[in-house]
């Protein structure tokens, strides 16, 4: 029951009321400032970059362009002589211009051929030609930016690739475009315990000096997918613990969150027994769309389950005595990884690729 006081009786402690109010206000202001300093800045609408390859990608882009910030068609190649070839489907160009979507096509070493990119990085003539070609590509196609999709670079070319990216950024920026790079992720500097781990380190993961690249480039698309592939046993395309471990490592190097676009998978994977004359009998992993994954499960009369640890949907079933496996990157899995973008205050996300996604994915993108 509240204490009733005589209005004429002075309230005890009134001489201290004003200083106490000042102290409370000061503490509140300090706490707000501390939280603002320590917490990551969360973008209201993270930049949504989607990759495109093939007709299904174009169809999806035309239907969902209003939820795409940047479109990156994989349609340009950089050959061993430093020559860039390719173009962009006019439907992509027209829709991007009409909807205000940035055009940031990929430039890749064709087939991710290692000897070709080694020559570009180490031969003076090919290197110079590549730099000129990048500047012309930017102006000739009236692009907003260019993104390197240069993969299967041997670790011995790490410094050469870093220097090439730095010089390319100067050329491309002068031409009025941004330059970014899609980079293969890793969780640390350890080559790993097995020959497989060491092979993937030497040829795929180890060649990226993330911090130096981030200093030269506008941002990095950090490809946290392909955790399991056709070269590995069945497993999630991008298991949540692995994705977050890769991201934490990148941040630990001092790469600013504002320069990180988290790579998200829209595709799924299917492992099944196969045989051909070259390879003989083997277990094969194959990238598939979400729609194809659901068709496979429907044909097998299998209901997938949710793996809460990996934040992914999966199924395994007996097909005449031999197991098959599907790991789906559905809308629920996509949401779990998208939450990392917000939690760590990242620039945005980069999705491989349009046309592979669960249609419900678009419902969760604001």
Stretches with model-predicted labels:
Residues 80-83, 154-297:
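Substrate-binding surface in catalytic domains of secreted glycosidases
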Residues 333-366:
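Acidic/aromatic/glycine-rich contiguous surface patches that form carbohydrate-binding/processing clefts
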Residues 71, 148, 220, 262, ...:
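Conserved, mostly hydrophobic/aromatic
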Residues 44-133:
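Glycan-recognition patch characteristic of GH18 chitinases/ENGases
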Residues 52, 75, 105-109, 150-152, ...:
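A cross-domain feature marking catalytic cores of carbohydrate-active enzymes
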Residues 22-38:
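Bacterial N-terminal signal peptides
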Residues 266-340, 361:
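Glycan-binding loop/region signatures in secreted carbohydrate-active enzymes
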Residues 52-65, 124-139, 202-211, 329-340:
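Short, acidic/polar
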């Amino acid at each position: 029951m509240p204490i009733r006081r005589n209005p004429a009786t002075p309230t005890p402690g009134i001489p201290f009321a004003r200083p106490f109010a000042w102290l409370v206000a000061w503490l509140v202001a300090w706490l707000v400032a501390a939280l603002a300093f320590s917490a990551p800045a969360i973008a209201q609408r993270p930049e949504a970059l989607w990759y495109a390859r093939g007709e299904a990608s174009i169809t999806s882009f035309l239907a969902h362009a209003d939820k795409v910030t940047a479109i990156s068609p994989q349609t340009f190649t950089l050959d061993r002589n430093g020559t860039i070839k390719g173009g962009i489907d006019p439907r992509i160009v027209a829709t991007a211009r009409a909807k205000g979507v940035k055009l940031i096509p990929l430039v890749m070493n064709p087939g991710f051929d290692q000897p070709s990119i080694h020559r570009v990085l180490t031969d003076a003539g090919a290197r110079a030609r590549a730099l000129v070609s990048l500047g012309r590509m930017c102006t000739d196609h009236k692009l907003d930016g260019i993104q390197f999709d240069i993969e299967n670079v041997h670790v011995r070319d790490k410094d050469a690739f870093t220097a090439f990216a730095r010089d390319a950024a100067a050329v491309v920026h002068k031409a009025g475009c941004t330059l970014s790079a899609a980079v293969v992720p890793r969780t640390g500097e350890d080559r790993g315990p097995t020959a497989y781990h060491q092979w993937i380190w030497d040829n795929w993961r180890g060649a990226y000096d993330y911090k130096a690249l981030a200093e030269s480039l506008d941002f990095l698309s950090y490809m946290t997918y392909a955790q399991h592939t056709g070269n590995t046993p069945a497993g999630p395309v991008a298991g949540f613990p692995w994705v977050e471990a890769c991201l934490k490592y990148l941040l630990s190097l001092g790469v600013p969150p504002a320069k990180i676009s988290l790579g998200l998978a829209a595709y799924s994977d299917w492992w099944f027994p196969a045989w051909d004359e070259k390879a003989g009998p083997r277990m094969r992993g194959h990238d598939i769309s979400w729609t194809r994954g659901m068709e496979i499960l429907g044909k097998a009369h299998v209901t997938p389950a949710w793996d809460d640890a990996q934040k992914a949907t999966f199924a395994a079933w007996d097909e005449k005595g031999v197991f098959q496996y599907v790991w789906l990157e559905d809308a629920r899995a996509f949401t779990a990884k998208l939450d990392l973008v917000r939690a760590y205050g990242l620039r945005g996300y980069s999705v491989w690729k349009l046309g592979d996604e669960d249609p419900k994915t678009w419902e969760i993108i604001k």
